[in-house]
From Swiss-Prot:
The reaction(s) this protein catalyses: tRNA(Pro) + L-proline + ATP = L-prolyl-tRNA(Pro) + AMP + diphosphate
Keyword terms, alphabetized: Aminoacyl-tRNA synthetase, ATP-binding, Cytoplasm, Ligase, Nucleotide-binding, Protein biosynthesis
Gene Ontology CC, one term: cytosol
Gene assigned in the entry: proS
Biological process terms in GO annotation: prolyl-tRNA aminoacylation
Name listed for the protein in its UniProt record: Proline--tRNA ligase
Keyword Transmembrane in annotation: no
SS bond partners: none
Protein transport as UniProt keyword: no
Protein's organism: Methylobacterium nodulans (strain LMG 21967 / CNCM I-2342 / ORS 2060)
HAMAP family cross-referenced by the UniProt entry: Pro_tRNA_synth_type2
PROSITE patterns assigned: AA_TRNA_LIGASE_II
Cited function: Catalyzes the attachment of proline to tRNA(Pro) in a two-step reaction: proline is first activated by ATP to form Pro-AMP and then transferred to the acceptor end of tRNA(Pro).
GO molecular function, one term: ATP binding
Subunit structure comment from the entry: Homodimer.
Length: 443
């Protein structure tokens, strides 16, 4: 992709309304544009990142055995009256009427709809277990949306819902998502710590929030420092191995970790002083087991092996991809701009042509772009008629993992300069070695 033909509306000045780093950098880097309070358009660069985040989430959901579907954003109020949540949910729910005066709503969550879908098709325990997920836009009318996509009114969510015959099966489903979330966040370059949390309006008696530590976090968290060194479950983990998953969850919940709502000062004091961490955190995922809270009132029942009908046990599991983009920036940036982890970067390489119009430099850049793309790398070539300093600043701001710097002086010596954005390390390599070098780094 040539930057001269791309749509990248970079801002030179820091927007006054941006309170936190991620909001400032997403606006400055031309990733998003605010359309109304808490509502953003995702511009091309931002959308590429958002899509890469959802790819990782989808891959780990599929690996765990969850099955993707897609539910609509508009829901019937009648479903919510069945569960008893229509009046209880409050003003965050955007309530609307269609032309026939039927009461509808813009879905803030999907427990009711997924339960209705399930009950219409599943009648027997032989069709269990099931875990269904979707990735869809939601709307919650926050009183005070702030911090950009970190706390917006419209946001993208991955919601998964598990259905099991009994509590034992439901807890195994919960453990599957617990492990899938650990792997998801690690692949996104985040160190997430699962913490005991309140269930809130979702309900239930078992819940964990996945928290990343960040100075700009909206909540106070308390945990044992040992979590920072815990190993992530491998891709080879068997999600059907009940004992192995339980052992992993037991290990990841063996030490103290709690949000402020669940904090127990006496228990925290029992943690060795050198291991105690009281910090700010950002919630990047939330999982719940809520038993028969929705299946009971909504009639989602199956016939068990004894021939008796019973309500299914359910859980729900949420990750916000649009919120995650901001969280990744909060965790990975410097004074110059964003530092994208390789797994979610919008492009792998920023190819900087330092002398546009010079025949040799233009030809070298064209050849390098072709070779890099043939090697499986995505490339954004800065072919704008700008001074080198402006190109370096843009490359640092948008944070692509590698910068390939092409200028007449280096070409005269048969060399190219490479810069690793995350570390700032630079190296000089032969022109023909660039593509093999970066392909090897990606692998």
């Amino acid at each position: 992709m040539r930057l001269s033909r791309y749509f990248l509306p970079i801002l030179r000045e820091t927007p006054k309304e941006a309170e936190i780093v991620s909001h400032r950098l997403m606006l400055r880097a031309g990733m998003i544009r605010q359309e109304a309070a808490g509502i953003y358009a995702w511009l091309p660069l931002g959308l590429r990142v958002l899509n890469r985040v959802t790819e990782v989430i989808r891959a780990e959901q599929d690996r765990s055995g969850a099955i993707e579907l897609l539910m609509p954003t508009i829901q019937s109020a009648e479903l919510w009256r069945e569960s008893g949540r229509y009046e209880a949910y409050g003003k965050e729910m955007l309530r609307i009427r269609d032309r026939h005066e039927r009461e509808m709503l813009f879905g803030p969550t999907n427990e009711e709809m997924i339960t209705a879908i399930f009950r219409s098709a599943v009648r027997s325990y032989k069709d269990l277990p099931k875990n269904l997920y979707h990735i869809q836009w939601k709307f919650r009318d926050e009183v005070r949306p702030r911090f950009g996509t970190m706390r917006s009114r419209e946001f993208l969510m991955k919601d998964a819902y598990s259905f099991d015959l009994d509590e034992a099966g439901a807890r195994h489903a919960y453990n599957k998502m617990f492990v899938a979330y650990l792997r998801t966040f690690a692949r996104l370059g985040l160190k997430a710590i699962p913490m005991r949390a309140e269930t809130g309006p979702i309900g239930g008696n078992l819940s964990h929030e996945f928290i990343i530590l960040a100075q700009t976090g909206e909540s106070e968290v308390f945990c044992d420092r040992a979590y920072l060194g815990f190993p992530i479950p491998p891709a080879s983990i068997d999600f059907d191995d009940v004992a192995a998953l339980q052992a992993t969850v037991d290990h990841w919940t063996s030490r103290y970790a709690a949000t402020s709502e669940m904090h127990e000062p006496a228990a925290f004091e029992a943690v060795p002083e050198e291991a105690r961490m009281a910090a700010r955190g950002i919630e990047v995922g939330h999982i719940f087991y809520f038993g028969t809270k929705y299946s009971e009132p909504m009639g989602a029942r199956v016939t068990g092996p004894d021939g008796q009908e019973r309500p299914v046990h359910m859980g729900s599991y949420g990750i916000g991809p649009s919120r995650l983009v901001a969280a990744i920036i909060e965790a990975s940036h410097d004074e110059a701009g964003i530092v994208w982890p390789d797994s979610v970067a919008p492009f792998d390489v920023a190819l900087l042509n330092l002398k546009v119009g010079d025949a040799a430099t233009d030809a070298a850049c064209a050849k390098l772009q072709e070779e890099l793309e043939a090697a499986g790398l995505t490339v954004l070539t800065d072919d704008r008629d700008e001074r080198p300093g402006a190109k370096f600043a843009t490359a640092d701001l948008i944070g692509l993992p590698w910068q390939v710097i092409v200028g007449p002086k280096g070409l005269a010596e048969g060399t190219i300069e490479l810069k690793r954005r995350a570390t700032g390390e630079r190296e000089i390599v032969a022109v023909d070695a660039v593509a093999p070098r970066l392909r090897g780094a990606k692998e």
